[in-house]
């Protein structure tokens, strides 16, 4: 935990001279990582599920708005399922998190992002599985006619690949561990749709239940990206590792030490604070998406016989 910019975020986005030396020393390993990732994806067995399968992914490790994007577009359709890995959940294998809004498991079993999707998408079913093909097959079993795949670019599926591109890219366009890319930056050319922040979509934020002295508490990737949306009433920032669970006793200690009047958290963090007795303010994030982007996704979905305009 740190209250300033985390080391890894500095390393990938604003490296010091010493960190730059380390980056170039590790570059040969980045080339190996890149080669393995590309070969693994392109040589994997091809799967065709015969329904619209839309992958909302990114080339960069960590958060880039995939969950908010799915939250924004999934309600536009009927008979939808979302398939995700379920990061940092305490379960293994395939788990049905919800069926058309009926939540079947607790947050710890689902993972924070999948649980957030289940809470907000009342018309959709949410499934988590390390093996995405099993998740898609379960979605079909549940009657889904459209499936959104959270972070599915690296899978060799017959799917519509939408890649989110951040407004501020990493300092170097290298793969891990010298950079933050999981595949070559040239892979953007392989996507059906590249969706760029501030060009194809805008982030719209608001704060529910604001107070005069808010303590920011978050466990998301690249947390300093929230800085542009924070009000002056934030008295301190506490950053935790992405997807980390919160120590409620530690939060209570920091709360009183800083004379805070509420904890400011994101919607993703909120699902892990259901047992927190401290006052909570919520930083709500929504996306305003260019209609042309939505039209391209609609056209793909309508290209399948199982879907009609009435389903949109």
From Swiss-Prot:
Transmembrane segments: none annotated. It catalyses: a lipid A disaccharide + ATP = a lipid IVA + ADP + H(+). This is Tetraacyldisaccharide 4'-kinase. InterPro entries: LpxK (IPR003758). Keywords: ATP-binding, Kinase, Lipid A biosynthesis, Lipid biosynthesis, Lipid metabolism, Nucleotide-binding, Transferase. Its EC number is 2.7.1.130. The gene is lpxK. GO terms for biological process: lipid A biosynthetic process; lipopolysaccharide core region biosynthetic process.
């Amino acid at each position: 935990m740190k209250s300033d910019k985390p080391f890894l975020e500095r390393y990938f986005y604003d490296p010091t001279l010493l960190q730059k030396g380390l980056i170039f020393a590790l570059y040969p390993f980045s080339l190996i990582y890149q080669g393995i990732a590309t070969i693994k994806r392109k040589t994997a067995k091809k799967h065709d599920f015969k329904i619209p399968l839309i992958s909302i992914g990114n080339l960069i490790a960590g958060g880039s708005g995939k969950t908010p994007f799915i939250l924004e577009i999934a309600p536009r359709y009927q008979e939808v399922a979302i398939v995700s890995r379920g990061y940092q959940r305490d379960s293994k294998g395939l788990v049905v998190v919800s069926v058309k809004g009926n939540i079947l498991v607790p947050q710890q079993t689902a993972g924070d992002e999948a649980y957030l999707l289940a809470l907000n998408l009342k018309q959709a079913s949410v499934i988590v599985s390390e093996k995405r093909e099993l998740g898609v097959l379960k979605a079909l079993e549940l009657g889904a006619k459209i499936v959104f795949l959270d972070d599915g670019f690296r899978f060799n599926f017959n799917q519509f690949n939408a890649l989110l591109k951040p407004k501020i890219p990493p300092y170097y366009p290298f793969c891990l561990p010298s950079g933050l890319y999981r595949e070559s930056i040239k892979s953007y050319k392989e996507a059906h749709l590249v969706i760029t922040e501030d060009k194809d979509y805008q982030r719209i934020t608001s704060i529910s239940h604001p107070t005069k002295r808010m303590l920011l508490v978050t466990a998301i990737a690249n947390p300093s990206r929230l800085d542009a949306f924070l009000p002056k009433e934030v008295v301190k920032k506490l950053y935790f590792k992405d997807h980390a669970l919160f120590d409620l006793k530690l939060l209570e200690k920091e709360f009183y030490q800083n004379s805070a009047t509420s904890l400011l958290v994101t919607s993703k963090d909120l699902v892990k604070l259901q047992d927190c007795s401290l006052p909570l303010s919520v930083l709500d994030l929504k996306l305003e998406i260019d209609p042309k982007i939505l039209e391209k996704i609609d056209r793909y979905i309508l290209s399948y016989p199982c879907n009609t305009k009435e389903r949109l």
